[in-house]
Amino acid sequence: MSSALRSRARSASLGTTTQGWDPPPLRRPSRARRRQWMREAAQAAAQAAVQAAQAAAAQVAQAHVDEDEVVDLMTDEAGGGVTTLTTLSSVSTTTVLGHATFSACVRSDVMRDGEKEDAASDKENQRRPVVPSTSSRGSAASGDGYHGLRCRETSAMWSFEYDRDGDVTSVRRALFTGGSDPSDSVSGVRGGRKRPLRPPLVSLARTPLCRRRVGGVDAVLEENDVELRAESQDSAVASGPGRVPQPLSGSSGEESATAVEADSTSHDDVHCTCSNDQIITTSIRGLTCDPRMFLRLTHPELCELSISYLLVYVPKEDDFCHKICYAVDMSDESYRLGQGSFGEVWPLDRYRVVKVARKHSETVLTVWMSGLIRTRAAGEQQQPPSLVGTGVHRGLLTATGCCLLHNVTVHRRFHTDMFHHDQWKLACIDSYRRAFCTLADAIKFLNHQCRVCHFDITPMNVLIDVNPHNPSEIVRAALCDYSLSEPYPDYNERCVAVFQETGTARRIPNCSHRLRECYHPAFRPMPLQKLLICDPHARFPVAGLRRYCMSELSALGNVLGFCLMRLLDRRGLDEVRMGTEALLFKHAGAACRALENGKLTHCSDACLLILAAQMSYGACLLGEHGAALVSHTLRFVEAKMSSCRVRAFRRFYHECSQTMLHEYVRKNVERLLATSDGLYLYNAFRRTTSIICEEDLDGDCRQLFPE
């Protein structure tokens, strides 16, 4: 289930050091680098002009001394000589003023528009040399750290970037100590006119998360009046349970900060927004948000006030961290309910769990999906009384709360998931049919009404509640984990989450549809598996929007086959896990590791062997009805693959077919087909296994898991 996301700035433990430090400067694109070279050239020219003016002034001073000596020696001669000296002195003075004027002109060009000083300051600058700023991005008019913040405009958004460590420190020290703004001297008067004052806006520039360990326990630092919220894309929850990221430290200006890896690919996500009680100005062009919307919300909710954007407002209670984040017991790893590549799940109480994500992008996507599902499901059908207030809508699990500071989302607690469910009996086949019908309805709703593709349909992501008096009976099922979910292409650049906690708006990444990042390798639909085997760089074949839903239902069919094997194999669950499932997952781990290491050819080879195990599953459960599946797959491999890969495929298929024999399930299949619910599930599995090529994705999704 790994996802090759873009590299983000990560944080690491501060260790035993006590000295605070600031993050290194971000790398700039070539356009910004060219502008910087122009500034440096202008500053060098200005400095050279000033040095020339100083040298000329020294010559004039020496000329005055020589003039006095000459006048003393020539008191008896005619006044023509004195006139000559006076003329030379005038020429020298004119030269000095000319150099000074050139220096002022160069300095004015370097300064931004509207920041030229008045005539009095120009005269003052003529009498002192211009000291070039030590900051590579600072304004030439001032070397103060305040000008270490500059606006950078990209194709996606606007942002503020830090210049160097000293600039960041000076800015934060001024904020925390209540120091005056270095631009206040010219803020009221600019160009000889007073500027109208505007309401105060709070700058919420992204800063790294800070941590500090005191005696083995996290020390929660009090926040200052100026809330510089940490919104790092890769705050490392992965460093272990019980480690809580902390806000900025006190007014001394020293910070406990973690190491940050600067990567140019993260620049598109660096942003700065400003907000007050009436408006939230975002870094997304043409988008402003109303913070008063949060007053009536208790959960993330979609507010379709604009036709251009899908805005999900994410509220946060004032005591959320006290009641949720600090209430989670992470002292014992045995309490942990689940762990994956995207985060960890810990119990909060009897009815709720907390998901601690490894990346902020995971949390942002989760709450945006939650708000979208909750709002779209509200107008579809009434929620069952047992699910009111639980965050489960149309068979989809949603988050009921969120904290960006600690990267936490709150969800309803279920008994277990389908992968860990170990009580399977034919007597409860009616409950299994209800569960898979609920999941199929959830997938259709997600694709048709929400226009989002889940891309991670696995037994591990299907949460279930069982009857405590009959553990084999599934009472309730819900689909969860939207880590790999992507909106449809027509939603690109439109999906935004607005957070009350930080007063910021975060855009949801556009769809990429790389097949190697879609689905778990063992449950990937067969048409997509074949495309990935032929081309590791392949993307989802978007020839029509109905292909998304067909692909999702095909993946659900693979999950159904996984559960039917547990239900029908007469050898028992333990034998299925050690034999059949071990072969299915044998190469899935290798595919994920190869994908993480960027070895796409190795990932493709592993997926080829997984295809053999998937084919064996279908042949075992369907018997003679699976002959078409086997023959079509073998012809595809022989036509598309090299001889060595064909031999490897045949060897592994032979190994799987020796373990997955139809004789092990034949009698139980007959008993299954004797019931209407069993016949429904068996036919649903047959229809999904018939989706074996790209053209089959153009079918009618209503024929799969019909109502």
UniProtKB/Swiss-Prot annotation:
Which residues are the signal sequence here?
none
Q: Which reaction does it catalyse?
A: L-seryl-[protein] + ATP = O-phospho-L-seryl-[protein] + ADP + H(+); L-threonyl-[protein] + ATP = O-phospho-L-threonyl-[protein] + ADP + H(+)
- Listed EC numbers: 2.7.11.1
Q: Which domain of life is it from?
A: Viruses
The cross-references to Pfam families, in alphabetical order and at most eight, read: UL97 (PF06734)
Keywords annotated in UniProt: Host-virus interaction, Kinase, Modulation of host cell cycle by virus, Serine/threonine-protein kinase, Transferase, Virion
Classification via InterPro entries: Herpes_UL97, Kinase-like_dom_sf, Tyr_kinase_AS
Query: One MF term from GO for this chain?
Result: protein serine/threonine kinase activity
The UniProt PTM text for this protein says: Autophosphorylates on serine and threonine residues.
Composition bias, Basic and acidic residues? 113-127
User: Can you tell me which family this protein belongs to?
Assistant: Belongs to the protein kinase superfamily. Tyr protein kinase family. HCMV ganciclovir subfamily.
What protein name does the entry list? Serine/threonine protein kinase UL97
